[in-house]
């Protein structure tokens, strides 16, 4: 391998005259700033000026005298006229479709931010029979189950054997719970106030205590709006609800006189097949008998995509008029369900009840004597507000054999098997107040101007 020669310096290269000439020629740059070689032999064409070929002056336009041209003009005007008419008719149609649902005047008749529990408005409903749903809770006035703090109203389920002197053995056998002794029971029916645990009959003292509060007899509306700001509970088989019932059941027993469920949910996790605490439902209950309740025609669920309803506060609301009931969340632009009423097809016809029978007897129309002119009966009466947290049920809210449900609704010992599985469901319940519903505020508006009669 030959040894590489060291590079020559600039001064050394310039010492060779032949080398310098070649280098100078190769690196020569023109003194002119133009990048185009100044060669006289190149012809550069001058810029051509734009020349218009537009005809000026008066010239004959024979196509304008063609009769077909006049027809084309008329056709264009006809098309334009129909387009304009279409816009006008669409605007008129939109106006008449929206006009019945334009928000009118409302009078705020009640607002509560729960700095304290206003006992002039809120009443505890105390019973042990599940209020017709077969839930496993005993509703109480105990401050462990309902209380107010800086976060608002809390409705929290607790275990009976941890918050009372009733033992685990008492829950199952030879113990009588009689709420008539201290006159705490708010029902007039003994079966709602007295129970004895008996293993032979399968009866059991409710293993859960919770609370249910209502504005019955204090605050109610017939048409208007309701908004409740709340955070929902966390835990398997917990059933929170914000709902309304009629002040006077003028059409008869449930569901003849109706029920408005503003919000119902389940405390189960997102993996629960029927929808856990990432879902909530709005529903109307109505029908001539309990077996013919047509709630399934007027129910809808809202799923939250991220998180669930136990992680933050949401506004659950309805707007109720003679023509419709509108369910929404957080604001009126977030519609959950719209149920319109039709005077030509009242709810009795919508349910198809005229074709149904029970005990070989056709079902009579329970709303035949209604004065409603919009076909909205039974939702033409005053309704009051209820806030509660139940646990379990035997009415199908938690479907049998779904999500490892530990009891069968129709079983005589449903509460027993539910309680036996406490080691599975209790760890899913939130800590402290998180296992309950936290209500930050309630607002109720009556339709119309303040001081105006609600008889719309």
Predicted feature residues:
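GH16 jelly-roll
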Residues: 1-456
């Amino acid at each position: 391998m030959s040894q590489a020669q060291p590079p020559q310096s600039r001064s050394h290269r310039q010492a060779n005259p032949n080398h310098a000439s070649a280098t100078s020629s190769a690196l020569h740059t023109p003194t002119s700033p133009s990048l185009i070689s100044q060669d006289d032999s190149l012809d550069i064409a001058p810029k051509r000026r734009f020349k218009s070929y537009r005809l000026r002056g008066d010239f004959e336009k024979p196509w304008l005298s063609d009769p077909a041209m006049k027809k084309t003009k008329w056709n264009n005007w006809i098309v334009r006229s129909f387009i304009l008419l279409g816009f006008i008719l669409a605007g008129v149609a939109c106006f008449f479709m929206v006009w019945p649902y334009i928000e009118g005047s409302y009078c705020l008749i009640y607002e509560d931010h729960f700095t304290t529990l206003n006992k002039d408005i809120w009443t505890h409903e105390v019973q042990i029979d599940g209020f017709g749903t077969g839930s496993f809770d005993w509703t109480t006035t105990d401050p462990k189950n309902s209380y107010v703090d800086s976060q608002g109203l809390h409705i929290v389920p607790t275990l009976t054997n941890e918050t009372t002197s009733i033992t685990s053995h008492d829950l199952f056998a030879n113990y009588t719970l009689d709420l008539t002794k201290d006159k705490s029971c708010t029902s007039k029916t003994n079966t709602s106030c007295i129970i004895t645990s008996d293993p032979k009959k399968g009866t059991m003292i409710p293993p859960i205590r919770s609370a249910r509060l209502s504005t019955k007899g204090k605050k109610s509306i017939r048409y208007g709006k309701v908004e409740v700001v709340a955070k929902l509970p966390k835990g398997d088989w917990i059933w929170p609800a914000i709902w309304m019932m009629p002040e006077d059941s003028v059409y008869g027993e449930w569901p003849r006189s109706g029920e408005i469920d503003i919000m119902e949910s389940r405390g189960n996790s997102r993996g629960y097949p029927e929808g856990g605490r990432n879902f909530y439902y709005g529903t109307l209950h109505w029908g001539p008998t309990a077996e013919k309740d047509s709630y399934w025609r007027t129910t809808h669920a809202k799923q939250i995509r991220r998180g669930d309803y136990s992680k933050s506060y949401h506004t659950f609301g309805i707007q109720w008029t003679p023509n419709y009931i509108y369910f929404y969340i957080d604001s009126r632009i977030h519609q959950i369900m719209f149920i319109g009423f039709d005077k030509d097809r009242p709810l009795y016809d919508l349910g198809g009840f005229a074709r149904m029978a029970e005990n070989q007897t056709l079902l009579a129309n329970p709303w035949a004597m209604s004065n409603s002119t919009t076909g909205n009966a039974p939702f033409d009466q005053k309704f009051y507000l209820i806030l509660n947290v139940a646990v379990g049920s035997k009415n199908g809210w938690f479907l049998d054999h779904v999500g490892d449900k530990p009891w069968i609704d129709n079983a005589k010992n449903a509460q027993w098997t539910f309680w036996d599985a406490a080691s599975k469901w209790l760890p899913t319940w939130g800590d402290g107040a998180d296992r309950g519903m936290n209500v930050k505020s309630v607002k109720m508006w009556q339709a119309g101007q303040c001081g105006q009669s609600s008889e719309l």
